[in-house]
Design a protein with these regions (language model features):
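Flexible "cap/lid" loop of the alpha/beta hydrolase fold
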Residues: 2-34
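Alpha/beta-hydrolase
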Residues: 21-93, 100, 120
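Short beta-strand/loop motif that positions the catalytic acidic residue
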Residues: 98, 104-106
Length: 159
């Protein structure tokens, strides 16, 4: 199992840090965003990516990627539906019952799920390994792809 930029759902320890103030302020605009205005949506998504990326943000690449996404989707607002999910089952402490070999990959400067979330997850899963990506936010920059792939391959071989 490989968990990337994740949090320990069902966490029952001391409070873990959450979204950065910049991210909360940005997401506060979701309610007033005109989802029929492609330029406004693209600008909102580009700022979301900038806030997620950390120092490796490539505005040109991300703008092109967002255009491609908007060309292919009928409902860009649905990208944010996961925030409305709820569960009926109590998951308190359930992550501690994971029994398979687990690798947790987390960005050092993640503004959505700050590093203590990844650390708590890795510490709570028996024998889990933690790979911290220096200078990285919530997204996986291309400069880390090869190292992540090697680490996942080694993790799989060792499982």
């Amino acid at each position: 199992l490989t968990l990337i930029a994740s949090e320990p759902l069902g966490w029952d320890g001391p409070d873990l840090p959450g979204l950065s103030e910049d991210f909360l302020a940005h997401f506060g605009a979701l309610g007033t965003l005109d989802w029929t205005d492609r330029q406004a949506v693209a600008a909102f998504l580009l700022e979301t990516e900038r806030l997620c990326a950390g120092p490796d943000f490539d505005a040109g690449f991300e703008a092109a990627r967002i255009d491609h996404i908007l060309d292919r989707t009928e409902s860009p607002a649905s990208m944010f539906n996961h925030a409305t999910m709820s569960v009926a089952e109590d998951w308190t402490g359930a992550f501690r019952r994971i029994e398979c070999p687990t690798l947790v990959v987390h960005g050092e400067g993640d503004p959505i799920l700050p590093l203590p979330n990844g650390e708590a997850l890795a510490e709570g899963i028996p024998d889990a390994a933690l790979m911290v990506l220096p200078g990285t936010g919530h997204c996986l920059p291309a400069r880390h792809h090869a190292a992540i792939a090697r680490r996942i391959a080694a993790h799989i071989r060792g499982a």
